[in-house]
Amino acid sequence: MTTIFYTEPELVLSHGRKVLFINPNDLQIFKDIEVPADLTTCGFKIEATDEGEPKATCGSNLEVSILNVCYSPDRQLIALTTVGQKALLLYKSRPEHALLLSVRALARASSALAFAPDSSSVLVTDKTGDCYQYDCVEVEAPPKLLLGHLSIVYDIVWTPDLKHIITCDRDDKIRVTNYPATHDIHSYCLGHKEFVSGLALLPGNEGLLISISGDKTLRLWNYLTGKEVLQQQLPAPAVRLQMRELIQSKRYLLAVLFYDHVEAIGLYELELKEAAWSIAKESLVRAEAGSWSISNFALTSDRIYVAGAVNERLTLRVYNSADGKQAESVPAGWLDMVMENFAEQTCVPEDLSAWFKKRYDNISEYMERKKRRIEDQQQQHQK
């Protein structure tokens, strides 16, 4: 899985077993993290079954690959999860080299990752819908099961006041859970008709949440009441969301990656004017969609960094957010230098068609059988 995001002043790009921390202006690499091919060499403990044999899900013979990467709000910690040997790795961020603090086994592959606003713990959701809390101070402490969904969780955010954890899943639900009393659900934000793939809180506007979905909508919610505030139709199902504040508490740029559409990315300016929210401006960025498999993107003040695959090799391209054209100020040689770090690793984008609900039409089959039965009865009466 390819992860890319921007946290000032660094662009973070992850694929395979490597994470790069890049200057977005000249693409010079600040530092990197390379996860060992065998995590047992850095403290990973393989859990044993009742018979004393190692669990296959954590076997050392499986290829290790990074799934999710996250920076702590105080910029002191970096968390990442792996598949193959399923683990949560916690690093101390330093100017030159990140220092590994802990390696903790996960029961199942992760689906989303988020730090607490005070950087004291990290939340990991897995593909069965469970959400665990891992302490970042007492790194040997066992994880706490906080909440669970009945389907895979695609995104998770923790409100700045530490009072609510918000999760979204494949079954089109957005759940607002009280914290620390996570057995108590505060509210649901219901209305999406397909998977909810991304969430974002609006800085400076307490109680407001952005969501995107496979039902081709972007929605603004009051998550405290569960009420929808605004709905914006999209040209295609939405799978990734990035946000940037343009004017403090009043104007935001929302960037959405589309699934299987001629235009790869949509840019929407959300504005508060006369106590009402509206989409003041919208534009589409083609990003050469169709000529390569786009998997993720990051948004900076003036550029869009798009990651994808060409001939099963990781490819990074840069576009201007103002006009959607390829950024000529970024020399191709600089991009090649970044991509060379992943040259030995294949890049096969995730099949996002699996995110959509499988619908079975039993009625049509029943009606067809009934029709044939009536025709057979009529033929018998005619005889």
Swiss-Prot record:
GO terms for cellular component: cytosol; female germ cell nucleus; male germ cell nucleus; nucleus; tRNA methyltransferase complex. It is found in: Nucleus; Cytoplasm. It comes from Drosophila mojavensis. Belongs to the WD repeat TRM82 family. This is tRNA (guanine-N(7)-)-methyltransferase non-catalytic subunit wuho. HAMAP family: TRM82. The keyword Heme does not apply. Its main location: nucleus. Transmembrane segments: none annotated. Pathway: tRNA modification; N(7)-methylguanine-tRNA biosynthesis. Required for the Mettl1-dependent formation of N(7)-methylguanine at position 46 (m7G46) in tRNA. In the Mettl1-wuho methyltransferase complex, it is required to stabilize and induce conformational changes of the catalytic subunit. Required for binding of nanos mRNA and repression of translation by the mei-P26-bgcn-bam-sxl complex. May cooperate with mei-P26 and nanos to derepress the BMP signaling pathway. May cooperate with mei-P26 to suppress expression of a subset of microRNAs. May cooperate with mei-P26 to regulate bam expression levels in germline cells during gametogenesis. Wuho means 'no progeny' in Chinese. Forms a heterodimer with the catalytic subunit Mettl1. Interacts with mei-P26 and weakly interacts with bgcn; required for the function or formation of the mei-P26-bgcn-bam-sxl complex. Interacts with nanos; may be involved in mei-P26-dependent derepression of the BMP signaling pathway. Interacts with Myc; the interaction may be mediated by mei-P26 and may be involved in the regulation of ribosome biogenesis. WD repeats lie at residues 61-101, 105-144, 148-187, 191-231, 289-329. Gene3D superfamilies: YVTN repeat-like/Quinoprotein amine dehydrogenase. Keywords: Cytoplasm, Developmental protein, Differentiation, Nucleus, Oogenesis, Repeat, Spermatogenesis, tRNA processing, WD repeat. GO terms for biological process: oogenesis; spermatogenesis; tRNA (guanine-N7)-methylation. InterPro entries: Trm82, WD40/YVTN_repeat-like_dom_sf, WD40_repeat_dom_sf, WD40_rpt. It comes from the Eukaryota. In testis, it is present at high level in hub cells, a niche for germline stem cells of testis. Ubiquitously expressed in all testicular cells throughout spermatogenesis. Ubiquitously expressed in all germline and somatic cells of the ovary.
